[in-house]
A protein has these predicted regions:
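C-terminal motif of bacterial Sec signal peptides marking the signal peptidase cleavage site
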Residues: 7-11
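Basic/polar N-terminal segments that are highly enriched at the extreme N-terminus
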Residues: 12-20
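Short, glycine-/small- and polar/acidic-enriched structural segments
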Residues: 19-165, 172, 179-186, 196, ...
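Sec-dependent N-terminal signal peptides
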Residues: 1-3
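Short, catalytically relevant binding-site loops at active-site mouths
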Residues: 187-188, 205-207, 221-222, 239
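Short helix- or helix-capping micro-motifs
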Residues: 191
């Protein structure tokens, strides 16, 4: 009996020592939208937990706010337009943000009109007032890129209102501002359901492939936690594989 107990004790101790404690990671997302479905699938299907990550998801409501959370340490990882990391580098931040994984490669927003338009073309925006995005943000830059592709000068041929906070443009449009608005889901569908607007074009279809939304972390975090960065990417890939299957 004594021999049996001695045999079991080391085994029990070994199991306890090998039990891994999940790494806590705070992720700040730029917005909460079905556009980012693979990430939510990875969360709901437990892929982050499988990779040893205890994930907390926070919505920043704008890339500027998400990047601020990342740089101040409120978030470990930020999910936003890839342009934001360039701004931190150019701005001279010593511990700048670095993109390490990409989720979306097209614009995920839509042109919403006040009336149905069966055969929309971007030249219909000439002379109109459009509720756009934050200056220098990926949604606004891609929208202007599309306009230029269609020989439309964003600064001369139409009026783009960039004064409204991200996430508030749909409410402003419902309140009577603008002839068109550029909206992500679920706001585009919500406008249609209320009868306040009609989706007439997909910016993702018009833009082609672009490095639209990516995950980033501070340079120091990536250096100090390479295993966490890889585990996070693994979980994300599982979510992408699931949604594409």
């Amino acid at each position: 009996a004594v021999l049996f107990c001695l045999t079991l004790l080391p085994a029990c101790g070994k199991d306890t020592a090998n039990t891994k404690v999940a790494t806590k990671v705070t992720l700040n997302e730029v917005a909460h939208s079905i556009f980012y479905a693979p990430m939510y699938v990875a969360i709901e299907n437990g892929y982050f937990a499988e990779e040893g990550i205890d994930l907390t998801l926070v919505t920043g409501f704008g890339a500027d706010k998400t990047m601020t959370a990342l740089l101040t340490g409120e978030a470990d990882i930020g999910f936003m337009g890839s342009e934001s990391t360039i701004y931190t580098y150019v701005g001279g931040n010593e511990d700048y943000a670095v993109n390490f994984a990409q989720l979306t490669q097209r614009a995920g927003n839509f042109v919403v009109s006040r009336t149905p338009i069966d055969n929309f073309s971007f030249d219909m925006l000439i002379g109109k007032n459009v509720l756009g995005g934050r200056p220098g943000g990926m949604p606004e830059m891609v929208f202007e890129y599309i306009l230029l592709k269609n020989n439309i000068d964003p600064s001369q041929d139409l009026s783009i209102d960039q004064s409204i906070d991200f996430g508030s443009t749909a409410a402003a449009f419902s309140g009577g501002q603008g002839d068109f608005t550029i909206e992500f889901e679920p706001h585009a569908t919500a406008l249609e359901e209320k009868g306040d607007g009609f989706v007439v074009a997909s910016l993702g279809e018009a833009s082609g492939y672009v490095p639209y939304t990516a995950f980033s972390a501070k340079k120091s975090y990536i250096k100090e936690h390479p295993d966490t960065i890889q585990a996070f990417t693994n979980a994300l890939q599982k979510g992408m594989d699931y949604t594409s299957s």
